Amino acid sequence: MAGNSQRRGAVRKPGTKKGPTVGSGGVRRRGLEGKGATPPAEQRTKHPAAKRAAVQRKIADAKQRRLKQGDEAEMVLGRNPVLECLRTGVPATALYVAVGADNDERLTESVALAADAGIAILEVPRPDLDRMSTNGLHQGLALQIPPYKYAHPDDLLARARAEAQPALLVALDNISDPRNLGAIVRSVAAFGGHGVVIPQRRSASVTAVAWRTSAGAAARLPVARATNLTRTLKDWQDKGITIVGLDAGGDTELDNLDGVGDIAVVVGSEGKGLSQLVRKTCDAVVSIPMAGPVESLNASVAAGVVLAEIARQRR
């Protein structure tokens, strides 16, 4: 007979497949059927993989918080930003160059400056550089900046005491722009200040942008972080430091400020000004008299004006 109809096993013997139980309507059998696709192990709360995934999420969240606080290495991307960092002496640990990157004057100078500074120069495949820069626009060049090593607020006062000079300190309140931070650091260094203190939270950090704006002053002037800025200011008051706030609505004009003694200038943001607690802590709040219709100055410009006046009085 044609075909495989006579092959042993080709025809199921009667009674080999049990149907639904008579009288049950197949309910008990259907109850054993699956309830859909099994979710991934990471989504099953009691599975070890889910616990591991939860731990990894916590680690990632913590890392993200540290990144926001400037406690992690930073990647500067692009040929112009990288070259500017190297020209201004921003400390770096590695210069990454993509394999096959188009050579131009910026790339050549960046490699030369990195070599002169003893910075490691690493040639990496472009996909690796894409991954390292989280697919940012790197133009085949990236510079790794180590996290800034902040001083303690007490170190700033100790530095002033060691130089046997009246202390000149600057505290920043609500300053979120790293360019303002860098410009203020530059002014403090230019006018003989002993350091800058910033809050640990809700403040700009010493990033590559701040480094570049400071024109290298961040390498010479210590920047400290205060867990609680108000508490730090009160501690300085107890040690004989006059706390002077800088605000457009201040009750004392800059012309009447006595800047000869130990002083700490607190600079608020152009928009928010000084926070309420910091303002209450100040011994005086100074304003800068202006002849024109401008109501306020940029925070870094205002800080420079006050520091220049204090330096003039001390000469």
From Swiss-Prot:
Record carries keyword Transferase: yes
A Pfam short name: SpoU_methylase
Domain of life: Bacteria
CDD domains given in the database record: SpoU-like_RlmB
Region (Disordered): 1-53
Keywords recorded for this protein, A-Z: Methyltransferase, S-adenosyl-L-methionine, Transferase
GO terms of molecular function: RNA binding; RNA methyltransferase activity
Example of a GO cellular component annotation carried by this entry: cytosol
First-tier enzyme category under EC: transferase
EC number in record: 2.1.1.-
BP GO annotations: methylation; RNA processing
InterPro entries in UniProt: Alpha/beta_knot_MTases (IPR029028), Ribosomal_eL30-like_sf (IPR029064), rRNA_MeTrfase_TrmH (IPR004441), SpoU_MeTrfase (IPR001537), SpoU_subst-bd (IPR013123), tRNA_m1G_MTases_N (IPR029026)
Family per similarity comment: Belongs to the class IV-like SAM-binding methyltransferase superfamily. RNA methyltransferase TrmH family.
PANTHER family, alphabetized: 23S RRNA (GUANOSINE-2'-O-)-METHYLTRANSFERASE RLMB
Protein's UniProt name: Uncharacterized tRNA/rRNA methyltransferase MAB_0572
Organism placement in taxonomy: Bacteria, Bacillati, Actinomycetota, Actinomycetes, Mycobacteriales
